[in-house]
């Protein structure tokens, strides 16, 4: 695919400015942009910067559905879309939203994939061919007759993508399509997008916070802030040369580019190095150094989890699950004699492939599900007879979809709602609500309607509502969906402080980097069973077992494993900070070097002889 061969823009945006109803702040401000046919564009930026608003202009959802004040023009192949209707653009611009449930209409997977083509009046045989093709492309073959409500979040997301692909649009917009997918599922979807772009020349616009997964496969990167496009260029150039600006926006560079930059890659005319090249640079750097390293030489991990407060002897575990059995409504087995023990004050990451049973297991702790047999104890007390309302005083649960637990007319009212139901005095309610809003950086939006917030901001609002209730056990079910890295880390840093005060945290996530950085213990589920359970470093040192569960260790852990296979004496590493600290202690000269000078360190061994770098 060579987008440069097609010089005429497929899409042109001219001076687009837009305000949502009842909002004085512009969601988009004087945006000018051209896209060529066949481009694969990554659209990045902090939560609430206008990314989703911008792409919704392409099929007239903004302002046709959203209302508000709109000025400027959107042209598709030179045609002004000002007077076009949303439905008339469905064949030209497909859109996959952050929340797949907003665009799933049918009972089964196959019926939903057929929904669009049926509305086009296509012959039955053509519809069947399209559905069969899409089922294979999005990895849902075998699930065609499954009811939508029985699917995991990731399976629903792939169904939504498939429904768009069945329409065969020229432009496909994907608003965080991998947010609910495990690493294996993310890889499958991104490979699919890569194939569509390369083989069909489908123009792709991808909004994504998972930069590690996508930066190498896109042609172009756009960065937005406060309703404007502020950066536009090749991904690796922006990620390396504008790192300081990106960090200020809460956009952290991919682990790969951060490590490569630290090792001296990305000079003026360099390109993205391969993983093997990165590994070779590390090998030669470490072989050239014979400095003896002591544990005390390593800098303290920035991500180090505070040790839980010591527990008195004979204190029961905070959570004890014994012989838990549960079946779904369709009769399929979720768990069979599952056992799990969680100590008070632990920070536990619950990982696993889509459909492994993570959310179903966590839902038992708040009373959303009732086991067929077995029992669950909180602080030594059997909760089988407890209502969800009673459990909510002890257990705070954040859903994957924040809209499932937001229903008032203002941000402040939302945080106060649970407190009012507990009958607290008004003064205490206000104090707790203000504190929770400040913690989640939402004080400035206290009078705004929740649905005028971005998805990431609504996610933080749901968390604020939970934190105001001060539960002892926090269950965070994919809390990072729709948020930029800066907000994610600020949020999890605050959760970690609560954990340090003794609160137990269960983090359900597909983000291996965050699990490695924040959790002290990792539990991996596979097909309704506990597959791996242990300290984070130990679990992430088992790549084969993780791969069998559809997971992949974070990059520093993989590098450390491969270096040990090459005979390098290196400890288990989990984060980029771990790797940098180790390298600085092992190779003190790195601390004083600029990134582009580091390659000179490995050019000579002890005898002064040159060694081959690549």
Swiss-Prot record:
Transport as UniProt keyword: yes
Domain of life: Archaea
Stretches assigned to the ABC transporter domain: 11-251, 319-552
Function: Probably part of an ABC transporter complex. Responsible for energy coupling to the transport system.
Database matches in InterPro entries: AAA+_ATPase, ABC_transporter-like_ATP-bd, ABC_transpr_CbiO/EcfA_su, ECF_ABC_transporter_ATP-bd, P-loop_NTPase
One GO MF term: ATP binding
Name under which the protein is recorded: Putative ABC transporter ATP-binding protein MA_1747
Cell location: Cell membrane
Membrane topology: Peripheral membrane protein
Binding site for ATP 1: 45-52
E.C. designation(s): 7.-.-.-
A GO cellular-component term linked to this record: ATP-binding cassette (ABC) transporter complex
SMART domains, per database record: AAA
Broad class of enzyme this protein falls into: translocase
Recorded family membership: Belongs to the ABC transporter superfamily.
Gene3D superfamilies: P-loop containing nucleotide triphosphate hydrolases
Residues binding ATP 2, per UniProt: 352-359
Major subcellular location class: membrane
Pfam family, one: ABC_tran
Keywords: ATP-binding, Cell membrane, Membrane, Nucleotide-binding, Repeat, Translocase, Transport
């Amino acid at each position: 695919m060579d987008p440069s061969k097609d010089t005429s823009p497929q899409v042109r945006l001219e001076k687009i400015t837009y305000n949502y109803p009842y909002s004085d702040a512009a969601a988009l401000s004087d945006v000018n942009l051209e896209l060529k046919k066949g481009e694969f564009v990554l659209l990045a930026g902090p939560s609430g910067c206008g990314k989703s608003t911008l792409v919704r202009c392409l099929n007239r959802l903004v302002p046709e559905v959203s209302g508000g004040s709109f000025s400027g023009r959107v042209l598709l192949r030179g045609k002004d879309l000002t007077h076009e209707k949303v439905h008339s653009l469905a064949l030209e611009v497909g859109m996959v939203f952050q929340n797949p449930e907003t665009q799933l209409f049918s009972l089964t997977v196959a019926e939903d994939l057929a929904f669009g083509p049926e509305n086009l009046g296509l012959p039955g045989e053509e519809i069947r061919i399209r559905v069969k093709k899409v089922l294979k492309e999005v990895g849902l073959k075998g699930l065609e007759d499954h009811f939508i409500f029985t699917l995991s979040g990731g399976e629903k997301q792939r169904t939504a993508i498939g429904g768009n692909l069945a329409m065969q649009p020229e432009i496909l917009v994907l608003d965080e399509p991998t947010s609910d997918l495990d690493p294996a599922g993310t890889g499958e979807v991104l490979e699919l997008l890569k194939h569509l772009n390369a083989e069909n020349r489908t123009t792709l616009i991808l909004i994504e916070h998972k930069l590690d997964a996508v930066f190498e496969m896109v042609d172009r990167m756009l960065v937005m802030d406060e309703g404007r496009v502020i950066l536009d260029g090749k991904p690796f150039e922006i990620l390396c040369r504008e790192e300081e600006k990106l960090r200020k926006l809460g956009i952290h560079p991919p682990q790969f580019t951060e490590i490569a930059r630290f090792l001296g890659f990305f000079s003026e005319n360099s390109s993205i190095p391969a993983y093997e090249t990165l590994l070779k640079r590390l090998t030669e750097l470490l072989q050239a150094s014979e400095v003896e390293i002591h544990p005390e030489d390593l800098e303290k991990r920035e991500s180090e989890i505070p040790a839980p407060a010591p527990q008195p002897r004979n204190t029961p575990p905070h959570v004890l699950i014994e012989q838990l059995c549960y079946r779904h409504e369709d009769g399929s087995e979720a768990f069979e004699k599952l056992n799990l023990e969680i100590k008070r004050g632990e920070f536990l990451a619950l990982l696993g492939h889509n459909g492994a049973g993570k959310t179903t297991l966590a839902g038992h702790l708040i009373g959303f599900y009732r086991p067929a047999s077995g029992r669950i104890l909180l602080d030594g007390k059997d909760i089988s007879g407890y209502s969800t309302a009673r459990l909510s005083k002890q257990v705070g649960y954040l859903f994957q979809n924040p809209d499932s637990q937001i229903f008032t007319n203002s941000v402040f009212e939302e945080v106060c709602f649970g407190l009012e139901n507990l009958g607290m005095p008004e003064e205490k309610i206000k104090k707790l609500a203000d504190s929770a809003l400040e913690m989640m950086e939402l004080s400035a939006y206290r009078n705004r309607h929740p649905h005028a917030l971005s998805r990431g901001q609504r996610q933080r609002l749901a968390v604020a509502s939970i934190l105001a209730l001060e539960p002892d056990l926090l269950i965070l079910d994919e809390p990072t969906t729709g948020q930029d890295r800066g907000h994610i880390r600020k949020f999890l840093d605050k959760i970690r402080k609560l954990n340090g005060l003794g609160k137990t945290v269960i983090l359900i996530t597909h983000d291996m980097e965050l699990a490695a950085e924040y959790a002290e213990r990792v539990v991996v589920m596979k097909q309704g069973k506990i597959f791996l359970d242990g300290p984070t470093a130990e679990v992430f040192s088992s790549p084969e077992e993780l791969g069998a569960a559809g997971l992949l260790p974070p990059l520093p852990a993989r590098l450390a494993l491969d270096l040990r296979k090459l005979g390098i004496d290196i400890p288990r590493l989990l984060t980029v900070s771990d790797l940098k600290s180790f390298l600085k202690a092992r190779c003190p000269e790195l601390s004083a070097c600029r990134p582009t000078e580091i390659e000179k360190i490995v050019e000579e061994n002890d005898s002064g002889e040159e060694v081959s770098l690549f």
